[in-house]
């Protein structure tokens, strides 16, 4: 597969994550589950940018590491989703989100737009 094909495959998964995030904006939906899905979307978007640089992304959930490899500066709020990769899944909370769901979703969608433009 070409880098663009690999990136498109990842973008399909991100679109599924974004649908889940949009459907779970209700504050009754657990922050830990919403944050995990948001973290996964950001992780995959960064991996899209890494793949488009014709590099193989590492098997890592560390957003700051992936952002460095993708040569992208992530907003602080998106970096704040790192907790949801592992800690919020296996430790007792609460784990409050680093910003409102709407703000986080907006920032994730901006990163998605960046990826779509990079694919061309």
Regions found by a protein language model. Give the residues of each.
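Terminal alpha-helical segments
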Residues: 1-120
């Amino acid at each position: 597969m070409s880098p663009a094909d690999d990136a498109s495959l990842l973008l399909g998964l991100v679109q599924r994550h974004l649908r889940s995030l949009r459907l779970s904006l209700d504050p009754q939906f657990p922050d830990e589950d919403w944050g995990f899905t948001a973290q996964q979307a950001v992780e995959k978007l960064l991996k899209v940018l890494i793949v488009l640089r014709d590099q193989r992304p590492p098997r890592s959930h560390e957003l700051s590491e992936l952002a460095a490899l993708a040569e992208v500066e992530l907003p602080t709020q998106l970096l704040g989703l790192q907790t949801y990769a592992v800690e919020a899944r296996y430790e007792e909370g609460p784990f409050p989100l680093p910003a409102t769901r709407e703000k986080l979703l907006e920032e994730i969608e901006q990163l998605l737009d960046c990826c779509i433009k990079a694919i061309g």
